[in-house]
Design a protein with these regions (language model features):
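N-terminal amphipathic/basic-hydrophobic helices that include classical n-h-c signal peptides
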Residues: 1-23
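Non-catalytic alpha-helical scaffolds and adjoining flexible linkers that form interface surfaces
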Residues: 19-43, 48-240
Length: 240
């Protein structure tokens, strides 16, 4: 860059400012939804992030000793995102856990539930879309599941119904009935009861699984998503 100062030619380097325009780093909070292997030692981490909404990031230099436990479903992380004007796939580094979630990780039932819920959100939330309040709501529910010690078998049903509300379509009788049929009175209980009481609604495994599948079809219809949840079978067997 050249400018004239009192008749003299002054040369100012713009390399640094140009670099800043191309790359900018931000610290953000993340919730892990899914990961995809990329090359020999990199991962694409699909997340729900506080700053960017539903977004995928490239993490380089991931080895077997890098602590893959960081990428378990619904893990709460914090990391530095480098934005680039040259690519829509931003890179991320410096990932650290924000909460150990020991109440979840020490329970096969809760781990299976988080695997299911993370997969639902991975498939339903659209890449690059920011849903106001979605991150905060999801984080609150993860910490709630982590803290509950008993009576959480109904948690995923409550989560799915609240997810529908967060997405902007509150379940009502007229449009919910075709999906849940005879189970509507039970679903109505879940929508009207406080959280703690909804966890105590008596359901056998078969009915609980049927309701979960029905609500998934309802969400699928309203989001125009192909919600083919692989982990549903595992959840169904575990809570049979």
């Amino acid at each position: 860059m050249k400018i004239t100062n009192n008749g003299r030619l002054v040369v100012i380097s713009t390399e640094r400012s140009e670099w800043r325009n191309l790359y900018m780093t931000k610290n953000t909070e993340l919730i892990v939804l899914h990961t995809t292997k990329f090359g020999e030692n990199s991962l694409v981490v699909h997340t729900l992030s506080k700053e960017y909404g539903r977004r995928s990031f490239l993490l380089r230099g991931v080895g077997k000793k890098s602590g893959m436990s960081l990428f378990l479903p619904l893990t709460l992380l914090e990391g530095d995102v480098t934005e680039s004007s040259k690519s829509t796939l931003y890179t991320i580094k410096g990932l650290v856990s924000r909460h150990p979630l020991m109440g979840i990780r020490n329970s096969i039932y809760k781990n299976t539930m988080t695997m299911f819920l993370a997969e639902v959100m991975f498939r339903v939330l659209k890449e690059g879309v920011y849903e106001q309040g979605m991150y905060e709501w999801c984080e609150k529910n993860i910490l709630l599941l982590d803290a509950i010690q008993t009576d959480f078998s109904n948690f995923h049903i409550r989560f799915l119904l609240e997810l529908a509300v967060q997405l902007g379509f509150r379940p009502e009788t007229t449009d919910l009935m075709p999906f849940v049929g005879d189970h509507y009175p039970i679903v109505q209980q879940f929508m009207s009861l406080p959280f703690a009481e909804s966890m105590l609604v008596p359901l056998n495994g078969s009915v609980r699984n049927e309701i979960a599948e029905e609500i998934l079809r309802y969400i699928e219809f309203h989001t125009d998503s192909a919600v083919n949840i692989n982990s549903l079978k595992v959840l169904r067997e575990l809570f049979a």
